[in-house]
Amino acid sequence: MAKVDVVERVTEIIAEVGAPLGIELVDLEYKREGRDMVVRVFLEKREGGINLDDCADVSRQLSDILDVEDFMPERYTLEVSSPGICRPLKKVADYERFLGHLIKVKTFEMLADEAGNKRKTFTGKLTGIADGVIGIDLTEGQKARVPLDKVAKANLEFEF
């Protein structure tokens, strides 16, 4: 099974296993580390937050299904955890949910903020998302608008 197919199937399984528990997939990594592949699953639970027991439940169920379906093309390690406090922002719904929070965005290419300063990293308060563009009030005082298709990586930042 191709890498894309593995990711799609694991995503489907997590949705099936997690939905009854109120658990959602935040991110999924399937990549080579050393000689083996790693399936790294990041989960969240909107009501009450994700805990160790939730992760263990999903891990056991996912592992059992992966063993039965046996579609993984090579040896792998399964890791299931919360996304942590610097949670990635992957979907439009993530940006909508975390309006007003401090975020860090890295782009594929240099982009200008409203003052004309070019950069690839934007840190500030998420002020909005519309028409595929996120608005950020930068920590330096400027504003920026970053198209989602230019975002290489985005995550929440811890506020002290």
UniProtKB/Swiss-Prot annotation:
SUPFAM superfamilies linked: YhbC-like, C-terminal domain, YhbC-like, N-terminal domain
Annotated keywords: Cytoplasm, Ribosome biogenesis
Pfam families registered for this protein in UniProt: DUF150_C (PF17384), RimP_N (PF02576)
Record bears the keyword Cytoplasm: yes
Cell compartment(s), UniProt: Cytoplasm
Any one GO CC term of the record: cytosol
Gene Ontology biological process terms from the UniProt entry: ribosomal small subunit assembly; translation
InterPro entries, A to Z: Ribosome_maturation_RimP, RimP_C, RimP_C_sf, RimP_N, RimP_N_sf
Biological role stated in the UniProt entry: Required for maturation of 30S ribosomal subunits.
Protein name: Ribosome maturation factor RimP
Phylogenetic lineage: Bacteria, Pseudomonadati, Thermodesulfobacteriota, Desulfuromonadia, Geobacterales
